């Protein structure tokens, strides 16, 4: 490792400790754009850096969008107009971050990937950031982002099924986020539940073969898969019940459910 690369990695770790994630991104982007393969540690640092800056803005967008809906429902048009302008500012930041990550992935990281594990990691990341774009965009832009996300998740899944065991944390994390994509973006609870259950059942059947170092990561993601299955199943039952009783209650219930859980770390033991 060259001194400049070593320094960038060290500064990224320092920025993470200081919770200065924009600077963490800046340093890891230098490493990622070097056209050399990233180590497991380096790609995890890159993922964590971007996940933190995108995560904060996704949370902000959800909060602001919720307030906007409430103001509109109260007929407060002046406040709603101000909020809309503020929401657009957050969306511009989200868009810039997503396109920045996707550019690094498509120009540098995916072409340089040689192992099945690294390809799954980067295609999953590509699927994630196109999914984040699809969360707040509309019309043709949203459709294109959703199509690109689906394509990336499918590419990652094909490689994962061929090259990684069912209990592998990366394969499980991919399935977790792919199922969230089906539920949230494609509005397909059936596909989401089918994928989550299939992957969970396959992993359960091979749990005994898990190495000690992967056990904690794998079982944590399996728990998240099960939590989402429980959430989505109860949502479906509640919505069906609400629709049978009162259409207005059904409409309200569809907007009042907890966020499904995603894979928040991409750490894989070397």
From Swiss-Prot:
Gene Ontology biological process terms from the UniProt entry: mitotic G2 DNA damage checkpoint signaling; pericentric heterochromatin formation; protein localization; signal transduction; subtelomeric heterochromatin formation
Keywords: Cell cycle, Cytoplasm, DNA damage, Phosphoprotein
Keyword Transmembrane recorded: no
Domain of life the protein comes from: Eukaryota
One GO MF term: protein sequestering activity
Record's protein name: Checkpoint signal transducer rad25
Subunit organization: Interacts with rad24. Interacts with byr2.
Start-end of Basic and acidic residues biased regions: 254-270
Organism whose genome encodes this protein: Schizosaccharomyces pombe (strain 972 / ATCC 24843) (Fission yeast)
Subcellular location: Cytoplasm
Keyword Ion transport: no
